[in-house]
Structure formats: C-alpha cells, structure tokens
C-alpha cells in the first residue's frame, strides 16, 4: 500500500514522502495514529494544500522537544527500592517508575518515552537511561537506585 507520511516515522521516512509499506502496518498502525494517509490523488492534493501548515506544526513540536531536552539533560532521578544485602532489588525499576519520578520533578514525560537499553533495572547503583522526547531528540538521564534493607 502506498501512503503519504504526515509525520516523521523512524526507519520509514519524513513528512510528505510517499512510501510503500505492508497493508497491515498502514491499516493497523500508521493510519489510525494519524501518521499517514492512503496515497490517493485526492489525498495528495489535500496534503499539498496543507503542507506548509503541517511542516510548521512539525517544526513547533521539534522546537518544544528540544527546549524540554535542554532542561532535562543531565537530570538525576533518585529512586529507593527494597534490596538484598548483595545489592539486588526485590523487584525492578521500570520505565513507568522513572517517568513517574520525572513527572514529580516537573518534566512532562510519558513512560513510552523512557528507553531502558538492558530492560528493567534490577541492581542498586547508577544507570544511564535514554528519554526519547521526539524522533530527533533523545536525552540521557542518570537513574540512581538506592537499596533499602528490609
């Protein structure tokens, strides 16, 4: 299926590009989330009419994400979990916990934006986590996990 991208999609293309994707990917993900439209002649004409408006909106989103990224860069998140003597946690620290703590600190972050490269954190110590605010803006945040003995 050929589609027109209404937003930048990682590993697929940028705003305004006409790309060919599998039908299921288009029907079940790209079109329902508003990232693409079917590439019919009417849709192409409508897109060209709205192109400047969509590019301006995309630039505003990028600028807002960059501004938030500058504030968020270098932030340290401190979390306390119950841990054993050897430093292993009884449970784990997930992207939900990190996003919740960042929201308490005043940053507007959704759990899907927090990227844990090695899965949930299961040991006490400092870890570096990536927060993807936009497809072009990713910020490194330090997560310090402290153990609390039972």
UniProtKB/Swiss-Prot annotation:
Classification via Pfam families: Ribosomal_L9_C, Ribosomal_L9_N
GO cellular component: ribonucleoprotein complex; ribosome
Record bears the keyword Ribonucleoprotein: yes
GO biological process, any: translation
Keywords: Ribonucleoprotein, Ribosomal protein, RNA-binding, rRNA-binding
Entry's Gene Ontology molecular function annotations: rRNA binding; structural constituent of ribosome
Taxonomic superkingdom: Bacteria
Keyword Ribosomal protein recorded: yes
Function in brief: Binds to the 23S rRNA.
Family: Belongs to the bacterial ribosomal protein bL9 family.
HAMAP family associated with the record: Ribosomal_bL9 (MF_00503)
Protein name: Large ribosomal subunit protein bL9
Organism of this sequence: Acidovorax ebreus (strain TPSY)
